[in-house]
Amino acid sequence: MALREIIILPDKRLREISKPVTEVTTEIRKLADDMFESMYEAPGIGLAAIQIAEPVRLITMDIVRKEGDGKSDPRAFINPEIVGASSEMNVYEEGCLSIPEYYAEVERPKTVRIRYTDLDGNVKEEDADGLFATCIQHEIDHLNGVLFVDHLSKLKRAMVIRKFEKAAKRGIKYV
């Protein structure tokens, strides 16, 4: 496993649409391992491959670890897609490893049905709700070049993007 640098807004690569994974290879499994290590070190509960400058449709998540009781449930999702969503909405305060130290409430479907491939190459479908639903939607957005600030008002989004552009020009690096 290797610790990888997480790219930060305003890096244009965050707006790239990630390419599908055509085969679950040793390289994809190693990338997932690197992502878990980088995600835990950050620390975060979800990471899309594009956030470490790898434009492939791979997500790692561990929402159990957020509880802080030493438990863990690392999960990898290859080519994840939302195949159904509830009309009922939920609001969570979201943050992002690529937009450090900024949090905002985002409204998303309360439950979603996802289809994905696991690291053994098995295609699976499952229902997600609560934090799992919010996190998987947030990470799938990354694979499509969408950031959580894109769900905010134009004014709030512009303020956040401007803040990070100014910081980048001044050479301020978030860690």
Curated annotation (Swiss-Prot):
Binds 1 Fe(2+) ion. GO terms for molecular function: metal ion binding; peptide deformylase activity. Its EC number is 3.5.1.88. The active site is at residue 139. Fe cation binds at residues 96, 138, 142. Keywords: Hydrolase, Iron, Metal-binding, Protein biosynthesis. Gene3D superfamilies: Peptide deformylase (3.90.45.10). This is Peptide deformylase. It comes from Rhodopseudomonas palustris (strain TIE-1).
